[in-house]
């Protein structure tokens, strides 16, 4: 049984790509058709490839992999944070700082500073410092927390990276490739898929689409860590849905109200 049904993908708008003039020709094999100047993603492939991504992430988690969720645009930020936390993993959902992976030593020093400021508040140091200095420390902490809070407890560079919109997160993807870190990603029709190891063809601009795919990757981690019982409720929900016999053409027409 597919981990994500065609019905779920359609309802979340996963099939809507970019305007045809903005496409990347390397995504041609994942495009089903064009409607009103918009490319429509082949959801039959998305169903199959989402299964492969789920299995990849699940197996990595079963081997105690450190998995980093990356999505810094506004449509992705909330889901990336929430699902990474739910799965007990790590995230970056604001601007990617160049060198986050390739200059991990420097990043660790900044994380150490963040933790030091937190300790200063906890042990009462703030109470004996001038208010102006405390204000500066709080400002510094807020900035560090914004960019590094999601990886503050990450024990090492990640073993796998899940990315929403690798076109936007090109720096993150390049750093991962340089270090040999496999990348699983939601790949829209405007993106070069060549640097992505495990591709999920999908609309990466709709909040519902991002939430759906990101949540499934979190489910994969939970299953890998704890066994199938932890996602039994999700599977039961899918099993309750009637099997669809519609073709993708018919589904697209239904969505467009034809």
Curated annotation (Swiss-Prot):
Coiled-coil regions listed in the entry: none
Keywords attached to this entry: Ribonucleoprotein, Ribosomal protein
Listed name of the protein: Small ribosomal subunit protein uS2
PANTHER family: 30S RIBOSOMAL PROTEIN S2 PROKARYOTIC AND ORGANELLAR (PTHR12534), SMALL RIBOSOMAL SUBUNIT PROTEIN US2M (PTHR12534:SF0)
Family statement: Belongs to the universal ribosomal protein uS2 family.
GO CC list: cytosolic small ribosomal subunit
Superkingdom classification of source: Bacteria
UniProt-listed InterPro entries: Ribosomal_uS2 (IPR001865), Ribosomal_uS2_bac/mit/plastid (IPR005706), Ribosomal_uS2_CS (IPR018130), Ribosomal_uS2_flav_dom_sf (IPR023591)
Keyword Ribonucleoprotein found: yes
GO biological process: translation
GO MF terms held by the record: structural constituent of ribosome
